[in-house]
UniProtKB/Swiss-Prot annotation:
A Pfam family: AP2
PANTHER family listed in its UniProt record: ETHYLENE-RESPONSIVE TRANSCRIPTION FACTOR ERF061 (PTHR31657), ETHYLENE-RESPONSIVE TRANSCRIPTION FACTOR ERF062 (PTHR31657:SF40)
GO molecular function terms listed in the Swiss-Prot or TrEMBL record: DNA-binding transcription factor activity; transcription cis-regulatory region binding
Annotated protein name in UniProt: Ethylene-responsive transcription factor ERF062
InterPro entries recorded: AP2/ERF_dom (IPR001471), AP2/ERF_dom_sf (IPR036955), DNA-bd_dom_sf (IPR016177), ERF/AP2-like (IPR051758)
Source taxon at top rank: Eukaryota
Any single biological process term in GO: ethylene-activated signaling pathway
Source organism phylogeny: Eukaryota, Viridiplantae, Streptophyta, Embryophyta, Tracheophyta
Amino acid sequence: MITPIHTQHSLILVYINIYSPPILSKLRTGFILWTNTQKTNKKRNMEDQFPKIETSFMHDKLLSSGIYGFLSSSTPPQLLGVPIFLEGMKSPLLPASSTPSYFVSPHDHELTSSIHPSPVASVPWNFLESFPQSQHPDHHPSKPPNLTLFLKEPKLLELSQSESNMSPYHKYIPNSFYQSDQNRNEWVEINKTLTNYPSKGFGNYWLSTTKTQPMKSKTRKVVQTTTPTKLYRGVRQRHWGKWVAEIRLPRNRTRVWLGTFETAEQAAMAYDTAAYILRGEFAHLNFPDLKHQLKSGSLRCMIASLLESKIQQISSSQVSNSPSPPPPKVGTPEQKNHHMKMESGEDVMMKKQKSHKEVMEGDGVQLSRMPSLDMDLIWDALSFPHSS
């Protein structure tokens, strides 16, 4: 009787010689239980891709090798650790010597033994339990979705964790998975070397704020060709680099130019000499420690001559600007006669006023304050005595 057995990856045709109906029924029920357990395990391990590939691959391999070992072994097999097969094979209906090969011919036995040298009978009872089972995480609230414009690159920590989780399964994964794992390890090493260098992704340039840069000024920066020097009293610098010494006179504040010098110290020394000549010991000097040098020397003679010439020039200008006294007046004889007549007329008027005053005083009226002969002014100036 030919019975097809369907699996996930292949179709196996098994020729079974039925010796006893109970054995066949037990075999079918055990296979159905095994397929149901595999379906539930696949649903649970849907999130982990690599363990799913590994278990499906290993179960298919074990299934095929178990069928061939079941057909070729001379001892009662243990297919995938199901105890029903062992109990069925221990049935008293089957003699041990009458079945050297259970379901196949000697030619098929040699073929299967050459393909699979190790029988399934050597597989332990808890073979599947020896594999590390993936722990199902507890149900946690789902994280909010990432709504950025760009995909996130895998972090180095996550890659190392996934590598450590996959390390127990490396011995069960075929060569194709080993090659992909090696490629991934190379990529991790490259990523480790790249993390030492500062890098920016396209998203950083897209979403980062632009930095403000100061505008370039069009005005030229003035380069100081001369070193900053100390400023002295009465000293200033020309725009071509020379130094000038000047002083003001104490009375009229007139500025006196003392000369042009090569250095600021020479100009300050000239100012000190002029200040000492004009003010003496009360002068404010740039170099008070060098006061003894100001009393003698060619510089003192030169500056003294400059000051004297300037003072003489100022005094001469003041004399020329002052007005000359008016000349004495010489009168003619006609002017003298006219002057005598004026004086005689004034004397007559004074005599008349005195006589008129005496007459008024005799009548009891005060006319001492009478300014003129105007009647309005006379009545305003009069003051009558109070009646008793």
